[in-house]
Amino acid sequence: MWRRIFAHGLKYDQPNASSKNLILSVLNTTATKREAKDYLSKYTNDSGQHNHCLFFIRDLHKVAPAILSQFSSVIKRLGMLGLRPMFVIPPSPTHVNIQAELLDSIVTEADLKPLHFKEGLTKSRTGLYHSVFSQESRFFDIGNSNFIPIVKPYVYNEETASEFMTKDVVKFMDCLCQGNIPHIDKFFILNNAGGIPSGERNDNAHVFINLSQELEHLSSSLSHNISTLTKREPRSQNLLHRMEVYVKKDEISSLECEYHDHLENLLLMDKVLSNLAATATGLITTVKAAALSSDRKNPLVYNLLTDRSLISSSLPRFKKKDGEIDSPANMFDDHAWYELPSQQVNAAPSNSDAVLVTTVLKKGVHIKTYDYKTLTQFNSIGLPKEFHVSEKGAKPSNNSPKLDINKFKSIIDQSFKRSLDLHDYIKRINGKIATIIVIGDYEGIAILTYEGSEENSFVYLDKFAVLPHLKGSLGISDIIFNLMFKKFPNEILWRSRKDNVVNKWYFQRSVAVLDLSIDLDPEHCDEKQSQFKLFYYGNPQYAKRALRDKKRLREFMRSVRDIKPSWENEKNIS
């Protein structure tokens, strides 16, 4: 399949046969056809720009030499795949020069040429900061240059003709990535602890973070954890609990430092990605994971080829076990709990499993939810007049978000490649809307309704749409499903055509799938041909009860089966 892609208009001028074979091999094992096209269009020599990845590596001096050698091979492989590395050394009173020497060896072993810069920033007499990436890019952001910048965390002050090590690494990195700098497509933070921890995943790393949505909550949670650890308070005044704090003081101190780094990593990601293109991606993982030779398991290589995490963040089978009690450190009680497989409570996370220690981050997209049961002219824009209501009664405030009906219809039309009968559709859903989720500027949308009997209704995903050019990118689908599962944690149903190529993705996010063509009630011959399958998601408690209740199942299936599509000229399809 990939050979046909290369043969028809997607040129990739590789310097040698081994690198071409590498690309073919990796694409065959890790990427979809769409991802392959996206990768080739971005990272080919014909794309007209040089793509860089910015590395920020903590405690490199603590990493075993064998791991460093493997990491050097990964750096070389990233370069062959079209991503040029750039390194920034974290500030440290004692280890900056050691880290510089180690990076020099890593770059040299990768057959590249290290280019050392002592000052990353220059502070002008006017107080403005100028980045070495902008001032000195002529040395490394050109043609087939093999020069790789290694930047120390120093600032040169023009007014005093002196230099100093930065004390604010977040501000340093923020200024470093401003101005006319080379195109940075990836920002990688490597350390010994891995990605941002999630209490719901037994302190394994979050899979994906949409910073626009989650930064405030996560930074607050991390700060709260740090505050809790700083107090060194025993669980009670019991003598054993007080002794526990004393005996484990070194462990607590180490954990406190680790959480400080996690918070700093989160803030670094937000500042750096804010200065880069909207498509730029951040990734936090361990040096050990980043050094893995397997292209399927190496989070850096995999993200380069697919622009996503090693696994999806919206898989509902990956959840905390029922009845599991949170530890005092699990402060993330407002984030999705179904991101990854739970482990035994006493089982330590394996640092060798890249899935458990890797977080992918995007600056992300803004999200709006419209919890209006009925659409009116007061909560929407462009609503057909037949759905206008009397001005009597309560109106939403002027600050309440209004749904743009024209954009609402446009994204559905584009995503499904057919025209929505707007009047028929609004007539069907009005009065029973559960919520409408809108991603960005109507780049993704989900319309959920209440179906079934009034006394025993259920939540139904009526429409799920993403703009065609964004399908598979930015994690929009995962973001929408995460929000749905969080907003309606008990159960959600949806249907899909039997031949829909997305059904495998739907299947992974459901706990049951039923064919709507089956006879729902043999005694009364309730059988109709249907081109749809029913997908059911529910937490274990609800799912166990609903899937064993034949009457409830019949209500699910009959209600969903008998919904008439609201496409123009297709209302008789079922």
Curated annotation (Swiss-Prot):
GO terms for molecular function: L-glutamate N-acetyltransferase activity. It comes from the Eukaryota. GO terms for biological process: L-arginine biosynthetic process; ornithine biosynthetic process. Its EC number is 2.3.1.1. It is an enzyme of class 2 (transferase). Pathway: Amino-acid biosynthesis; L-arginine biosynthesis; N(2)-acetyl-L-ornithine from L-glutamate: step 1/4. Residues 392-560 form the N-acetyltransferase domain. Pfam families: NAT. GO terms for cellular component: mitochondrial matrix. PROSITE patterns: GNAT_NAGS. InterPro entries: GlcNAc_Synth_fun, Vertebrate-like_GNAT_dom. It is found in: Mitochondrion. Keywords: Acyltransferase, Amino-acid biosynthesis, Mitochondrion, Transferase, Transit peptide. Residues 1-13 form a transit peptide. It catalyses: L-glutamate + acetyl-CoA = N-acetyl-L-glutamate + CoA + H(+). The keyword Heme does not apply. Feedback inhibition by L-arginine. Belongs to the acetyltransferase family. N-acetylglutamate synthase involved in arginine biosynthesis. Interacts with the acetylglutamate kinase chain of AGR5,6. This is Amino-acid acetyltransferase, mitochondrial. It comes from Saccharomyces cerevisiae (strain YJM789) (Baker's yeast).
